[in-house]
Curated annotation (Swiss-Prot):
An FAD assembly protein, which accelerates covalent attachment of the cofactor into other proteins. Plays an essential role in the assembly of succinate dehydrogenase (SDH, respiratory complex II), an enzyme complex that is a component of both the tricarboxylic acid cycle and the electron transport chain, and which couples the oxidation of succinate to fumarate with the reduction of ubiquinone (coenzyme Q) to ubiquinol. Required for flavinylation (covalent attachment of FAD) of the flavoprotein subunit SdhA of SDH and other flavinylated proteins as well. The keyword Cytoplasm applies. It comes from Francisella tularensis subsp. tularensis (strain SCHU S4 / Schu 4). It is found in: Cytoplasm. Its main location: cytoplasm. Keywords: Chaperone, Cytoplasm. Belongs to the SdhE FAD assembly factor family. GO terms for biological process: succinate metabolic process. This is FAD assembly factor SdhE. GO terms for cellular component: cytoplasm. InterPro entries: SDH, SDH_sf, SdhE_FAD_assembly_factor.
Amino acid sequence: MLIKNNDLIFSSVDKIKYSARRGMLELDIILAPYLNNCYMHEDLANKKLFVEFLTSEDSDMFDWLFKGVTPPQRYQQLIDKIIKEKKKFNQTKLK
């Protein structure tokens, strides 16, 4: 997916949230804390990487996020952040 650095998608959480809607509820749930708490604070390169990540197949994302399958190297830090943010959400919101 070709993404321009000046693409307005990077500045709109609503557009990203819409793009992040997946066909699997589990993915929606794990991506939401990252989107709500981290995305807008990321630099442009990381925002661009997340938008690229969203073009992945749901089955691949599920494997990387839930089954521990090794993702492409460029996504490893992002996936670690997504999982960390979900754990933080669980600790604070699900008590």
